[in-house]
From Swiss-Prot:
Induction: By stress conditions e.g. heat shock. It comes from Baumannia cicadellinicola subsp. Homalodisca coagulata. It holds the Pfam family HSP70. InterPro entries: ATPase_NBD (IPR043129), Chaperone_DnaK (IPR012725), Heat_shock_70_CS (IPR018181), HSP70_C_sf (IPR029048), HSP70_peptide-bd_sf (IPR029047), Hsp_70_fam (IPR013126). PROSITE patterns: HSP70_1, HSP70_2, HSP70_3. It comes from the Bacteria. Belongs to the heat shock protein 70 family. The modification Phosphothreonine is found at T199. This is Chaperone protein DnaK. GO terms for molecular function: ATP binding; ATP-dependent protein folding chaperone; unfolded protein binding. HAMAP family: DnaK (MF_00332).
């Protein structure tokens, strides 16, 4: 079995790690960075840029540069969280034919899993470049509070990228693995506070260490899948826009280019204010009107930023209380607090967490890398390379069915350790009822329609009887991958119906296969483009060296030989302007052939120069004696 890589597919940044022997290693991407911006750009000439290259051009291509796509994955267009983003994102969010939230780029509809797949492809390539072998399997992390649809959409993204997703695990759980694997920590209960670019999670995790065998059991989890650093950025952006409007009378919200520059500046200022008390937002030529160009130059203090976002930080406090209650623990039971996600570097966040738990969070866990490391550890467990580790995760939301009166009746409560199985007896609501519809739901609301519908099926052939007499046994069975199997059995007749809930990501099997084919075609196109660039570079180097040799030694060649070389250089230069790798290679060989005499002449001259240096009579052998200064 090959390596199973660990990927933290983040809202703002993504990270990849592997297990080497007994150690984990975070891999650097092609730009030399340990994290990759989760940004994908579609350029005018059809190229797809991922990471820093996409981020660098975002100011000039805002409508075709996609970021924070994780906030849309697995969501419906009419969802309140999506509608909040529709008005503030520079790119176009649309409703797909099935009602899901999709993107529109240059008139083409794109599903969020397709965009995430581009990021995963870069992660996959990073691993393959380092390992020198093909990588086909991965463990990918998701927020603990992601529902089944969001998890399935993430798995689909992996599949489109050419990865078999061996396991989807929760980000706080992965961080706990990274924290606890190589530490002699004994038994303890920890809290993982994960505030990333777009999502927030809190997980209470118990680590049992018995004779070196560690069990990581999630006791409770809670969170908000639409709260993170992007929201902090938006608060600062809105403040800057309002201040500029007061000063200049111009609303920058109508200028996509200005807003993209402002987004970058706000993110930079937010990061700087984690270390400094004050920073400047200086954006010359941010816009212009009839009176001329306008510049933005504003001072932002840490106190001002904190006043803008304090309510967002406070929103993370209630889930902490709920998680502790669900775990039947008090604050004093928590031995360590782990901070995960870049937004936890903000001093205000650290202070609020410290005040809540009455203890300082640990500083020995890298908030940007811990999740990817934990995913790699889980990959090592699945491949058999990591021993003595058992991970017991939970289902984040309750699972149940719709019963009489439109009520959701839960069969499996939230925070139940998986895998798990639970059965319950139900009956008919009317006399002589011959069939029942089993409507499977996920969520915490009492009213069925307020929860997430996962699917439904019918059990018919029930023998006529007074209502309440038939016994219908409904069984929910969740496996280790979080896939739900539901069955309904009439205990009187023995008739049974089953359904496997592989939560739909909104993409049909045919759509996924089509996207996989497109991704494979793009991979071939990318490979050809890379080969073309390498051939062009080879041609450039050859022309440069040949011109240099011709300038130095061309007067020692016959005129016809010089003409042949110059003509070959000109032909190669013309071929470089085209897109044919074969044409460039043919002209490279032609230039090498006609310049063979020049090359031989150059080598002879270089050899003669080297010989002269060796026999230079002015070089004197001498012995030196070290002379020490007299003190």
């Amino acid at each position: 079995m090959g390596k199973i890589i660990g990927i933290d597919l983040g809202t703002t940044n993504s990270c990849i790690a592997i297990v080497e022997g007994t150690k984990t290693r975070v891999l650097e991407n092609s730009e030399g960075d340990r994290t990759t911006p989760s940004i994908v750009a579609y350029t005018q000439d059809g190229e797809i840029l991922v990471g820093q290259p996409a981020k660098r051009q975002s100011a000039t291509n805002p409508k075709n540069t996609l970021f924070a796509i994780k906030r849309l994955i697995g969501r419906r267009f009419e969802d309140e969280e999506v509608q909040r983003d529709v008005d503030i994102m520079p790119y176009k969010i649309i409703a797909a034919d099935n009602g899901d939230a999709w993107l529109e780029i240059k008139g083409q509809k794109i599903a969020p899993p397709q965009v995430s797949a581009e990021i995963l492809k870069k992660m996959k390539k990073t691993a393959e470049d380092y390992l020198g072998e093909s990588v086909t399997e991965a463990v990918i992390t998701v927020p603990a509070y992601f529902n089944d649809t969001q998890r399935q959409a993430t798995k689909d993204a992996g599949r489109i990228a050419g990865l078999e997703v061996k396991r989807i695990i929760n980000e706080p759980t992965a961080a706990a693995l990274a924290y606890g694997l190589d530490k002699e920590i004994g038994n303890r209960t920890i809290a993982v506070y994960d505030l990333g670019g777009g999502t927030f999670d809190i997980s209470i995790i118990e680590i049992d260490d018995v004779d070196g065998e560690k069990t990581f059991e999630v006791l409770a989890t809670n969170g908000d899948t639409h709260l993170g650093g992007e929201d902090f950025d938006s608060r600062l952006i809105n403040y800057l826009v309002d201040e500029f409007k007061k000063d200049q009378g111009i609303d920058l919200r109508n200028d996509p280019l200005a807003m993209q520059r402002l987004k970058e500046a706000a993110e930079k200022a937010k990061i700087e204010l984690s270390a400094a008390q004050q920073t400047d937002v200086n954006l010359p030529y941010i816009t212009a009107d009839s009176t001329g160009p306008k510049h933005m130059n504003l001072k932002i203090t840490r106190a001002k930023l904190e006043s803008l976002v304090e309510d967002l930080v406070n929103r993370t406090m209630d889930p902490l209380k709920v998680a502790l209650t669900d775990a039947s623990l008090s604050i004093s039971d928590i031995k360590d607090v782990i901070l995960v996600g870049g937004q936890t570097r903000m001093p205000l966040v650290q202070k609020k967490v410290t005040d809540f738990f009455c203890k300082e969070p640990r500083k020995d866990v890298n908030p940007d890398e811990a999740v990817a490391i934990g995913a790699a550890v889980q990959g090592g467990v699945l491949s058999g390379n990591v021993k003595d580790v058992l991970l017991l995760d939970v289902t984040p939301l309750s699972l149940g069915i719709e019963t009489m009166g439109g009520v959701m009746t839960a069969l499996i409560a939230k925070n139940t350790t998986i895998p798990t199985k639970h059965s319950q007896i139900f009956s008919t609501a009317e006399d002589n009822q011959s069939a029942v519809t089993i409507h499977v739901l996920q969520g915490e609301r009492k009213r069925a329609m307020d929860n997430k519908s996962l699917g439904q099926f019918n059990l018919d052939g029930i023998a006529p009887a007074m209502r309440g007499i038939p016994q219908i046994e409904v069984t929910f069975d969740i496996d280790a991958d979080g896939i739900l199997h539901v069955s309904a059995k009439d205990n009187n007749s023995g008739r049974e119906q089953k359904i496997t809930i592989k939560a739909s990501s909104g993409l049909s099997e045919e759509e996924i296969k089509k996207m996989v084919r497109e991704a494979e075609a793009n991979a071939e196109s990318d490979r050809k483009f890379e080969e073309l660039v390498q051939t062009r570079n080879q041609a450039d180097n050859l022309m440069h060296s040949t011109r240099k040799q011709l300038a130095e030694y061309g007067n020692q060649l016959l005129q016809e030989d010089r003409n042949a070389i110059e003509n070959a250089i000109q032909s190669l230069n013309t071929a470089l302007k085209g897109e044919s790798k074969t044409d460039i290679e043919t002209n490279i060989q032609s230039l090498i052939q006609v310049s063979s005499k020049l090359l031989k002449l150059t080598q002879q001259q270089n050899q003669a120069t080297n010989d002269n240096v060796k026999t230079d009579g002015n070089v004197v052998d001498a012995e030196f004696e070290e002379v020490k200064d007299k003190k």
